[in-house]
Amino acid sequence: MFPDNKNFETWSTRELINYVLEYHHPIGRRRGHVLRNQARTTLETAGAQRHIVEKIVEQLEISIPDLDSHFDREEAVLFPYLIELCTAEENKQRIEAFHCGTILNPIHVMMNEHAMEQDRYGYLETLTDNFTAPAEATEEYRNLLADLKTFV
């Protein structure tokens, strides 16, 4: 299904797209929703870290729907056209121009979205001292930070 190595730089465009569609997006969606629910639940037992958990929840309430929307646009707009380009190249054919001018337009938008999410998770990393729980933290808070670090 996928190459044995995880050196993505050696993968073909088609292999990368398939990996994202079959693995990265489904797992990202599932983990994102689980993490957001976990953060909401952790609010109940956060104790001294409640103010931090509130900010984590606030950011995840924005991030997870944004990620879902981003994934949807990649799946509906970007990837189908890239697959069409790959097929045309393999068959040495030409295809019609992208419907909104150039494929670079949605790519730039999506790259900006990636940068915004990186900033958001950078903020959470700083807020949580690199996802490190203080000694007195609850087990739920420790688990939330560990899962958030894995998600990022």
Residues of each region from the PLM?
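Small-residue-biased structural context
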Residues: 1-152
